[in-house]
Amino acid sequence: MKSHTQSLLAESLNALKQQGIVPADFEARIQVDRTKDKSHGDFATNLAMMLTKAAGKNPRELAQLLIDNLPESSHVEKVEIAGPGFINFFIDDNALANQLMAALNSDTLGIELPASQTVVVDYSSPNLAKEMHVGHLRSTIIGDSVVRALEFMGHKVIRQNHVGDWGTQFGMLLAYMEELRAANGEQAKMELSDLETFYRAAKVRFDESEEFATRARKLVVALQSGDEYCNKLWREFNDISLSHCHELYERLGVSLTRADVRGESAYNSDLAQVVADLDSQGLLSESNGAKVVFQDEFKNKEGEPLPVIIQKADGGYLYATSDLAAMRYRSNVLNADRALYFVDLRQALHFQQVFKLAKTAKFVREEMSFEHMGFGTMNGEDGRPFKTRSGGVVKLIDLLKEADIRALDLVRSKNPDMDEAELAEIARVVGIASVKYADLSKNRASDYIFSFEQMLSFEGNTAPYLLYAYTRVAGIFKRAQDVDLSDAKIILEHEKEKDLGTKLAQFGEVMARMVSKGQPHALCGYLFELAGAFSSFYEACPVLAAETEELKKSRLLLSQLTAKTLKQGLNLLGLETLERM
């Protein structure tokens, strides 16, 4: 309905241009918004006020002219002018009911899909040779929910797990493994828990022993030069790390696979060419022996230009170099229309600089969009970054295990007589959903407080509340299995029926926002409001005990569409649903 309203206004504006009321070359973005007050209709626009200066008329006069030139539409019941010149549209109840019927019979809930694009999504991207910790959670689940939404909206999505699989840390690990195998033979274990120990012990050795540090640096050079022994060990480290990552992805219900991994090492052979191409364009400068690029747009507090370091004085490359190579690949090989980077907000300046440099150096197509989808920090209840009691980093697996335990206690308290196997399965779904939803329901650009108590509550905008809301709606159909809905149609007469129908019709608008802005919290908020609208409808409008058979069937259809929308929305967030809680 929103896009239909915009189309009506576009035709009216063209008519005013043809009549000479508005200059023919005037370009206006037609903004149509949902009204917050039902007395103001369903949609409102400030188009008349935008035209005032160009047309030389007062906005209320222009509003009337726009209304007079609107094409006829069976979707619109009436149009009114409000305030200084707002135009309010009231949608016809029958048109809304028809839209809802179409949504019921559609795999995409009746959403008008946009033109398909190829979208690269860079997310999760942990450093290998370490266990994933809670700091990886936000990128992983926010990115994955947006990926699901993009695919649902008909886009071709290329997942890119840009893992940190290269660099000095591998020299330290290789050197320490040599020491370990010298002491214990080839039987030295390579389990993931050992990798954590290896890393810490190797770092201590690197910091304390110059001989060890020298050996580690030589091993990095050997690794970069293709040494067979070093590469074999490096692949072992990476394989163990990736196995751990994908166990966590599976537990979290994240769609990343091994095929989506394209780490820093994938661009090693391209880095020298990046430097050479920047140099040939006269973009490189030297600063303290390093090769850097200065861009006028980026300065420090003193007004001095901030460099993008491309190559260190010792010849080593940095994140900017591999990011530029990756951008080139994503633009010119993958031929993407958009590239979305789900990376901590603290990297905002870095991405602003490399995005600008890639365009300046013509490494990427001018029309391609690069977007940093930054996110804030997950904090403990003390407001500080989430840590263990001893101040250490919280492993992601430990967080998920605790969520399982707490969810099991919660579910058991609600269902003391339930079979243990069923309890465990429900607790698994509730635990993972609660952790994910608590994050996804917050504006990604904001920091948030992690609280098991809040996220496992059945009250408020939480996963348990929404999962229960879904089971409540789905339960209606278990009691109405003998009702034939083949000839049923939706009727919107009661105020709460209209409210629920209006909320259901907003799903497409919310999805459009989620994919354009990368904001899962918009979908979370919508699902919470939808569950509330259904609750109000259910209390005011008897379903199985409706006054007439026709009304019962209509309300069953509204319930069916609510269940379908809740389930689809939760699945797009990466959450499983339950038929019983």
Swiss-Prot record:
Keywords: Aminoacyl-tRNA synthetase, ATP-binding, Cytoplasm, Ligase, Nucleotide-binding, Protein biosynthesis. It is found in: Cytoplasm. Its EC number is 6.1.1.19. A motif ('HIGH' region) lies at residues 126-136. InterPro entries: aa-tRNA-synth_I_CS (IPR001412), Arg-tRNA-ligase (IPR001278), Arg-tRNA-synth_N (IPR005148), Arg-tRNA-synth_N_sf (IPR036695), ArgRS_core (IPR035684), DALR_anticod-bd (IPR008909), Rossmann-like_a/b/a_fold (IPR014729), tRNAsynth_Ia_anticodon-bd (IPR009080). Its main location: cytoplasm. GO terms for cellular component: cytoplasm. GO terms for molecular function: arginine-tRNA ligase activity; ATP binding. It catalyses: tRNA(Arg) + L-arginine + ATP = L-arginyl-tRNA(Arg) + AMP + diphosphate. It is an enzyme of class 6 (ligase). It holds the Pfam family tRNA-synt_1d. SMART domains: Arg_tRNA_synt_N, DALR_1. GO terms for biological process: arginyl-tRNA aminoacylation. Monomer. PANTHER family: ARGININE--TRNA LIGASE, CYTOPLASMIC (PTHR11956:SF5), ARGINYL-TRNA SYNTHETASE (PTHR11956). HAMAP family: Arg_tRNA_synth. Belongs to the class-I aminoacyl-tRNA synthetase family. This is Arginine--tRNA ligase. It comes from Shewanella pealeana (strain ATCC 700345 / ANG-SQ1). The gene is argS.
